[in-house]
Amino acid sequence: MKQVFIDANVLVTVVNKKYPLFSDAAKVLSLADRSEFELFTSPVCLAIAFYFAEKKSGTSQAKVKLKLLLDHIKITRVDDKIVRQALNNAAIHDVEDGMQYYSAQSSGCTYIVSEDKDDFYFSEIKVVGCKEFLQTCL
């Protein structure tokens, strides 16, 4: 089974139907229905997705969209240890990206799917965009 961390930008693309990336991002999220994939995201990514969904669709609709996501995606932990790892790694300049990385790592993820791959320049986990992930893993 592949454990896959979904970054906030992929979630935002799906909840706001942002083209041209929407099709590939939606296909990646649909893999949660297949037994060989386990999808994860962090509370931070969900908060970011909610913020942008709420701006576009309003609070009520944004909550509905996130609840649908949660039917398919597991939530990683972001606790004291994760935050401290991100803060203590001198190679990490953006603490939010560091928290995403360490929460993915603590959940055993072997891929991070992000359209901002350069944000994870420090990652020992393979970081791929949606299209590349679909081409590699299907």
Label every model-predicted segment:
Residues M1-T41, E54-Q61, L134-L138:
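Short, well-structured N-terminal submotif of metal-dependent ribonuclease cores
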Residues Q3, H72, Q105-L138:
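Acidic, PIN/NYN-like endoribonuclease modules and their adjacent C-terminal/linker elements
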Residues L11, L46, V83, D119-F120, ...:
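A generic structural signal for short hydrophobic patches within well-formed alpha-helices
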Residues A26, A53-K74, K81:
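Active-site-proximal, substrate-binding regions of enzyme catalytic domains
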Residues F40, T76, V128:
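General small-molecule cofactor/ligand-binding pocket signal
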Residues A47-F50, L70, L87:
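Amphipathic alpha-helical segments within well-ordered protein domains
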Residues K74-K117:
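Active-site neighborhoods of divalent-metal-dependent phosphate/nucleic-acid chemistry enzymes
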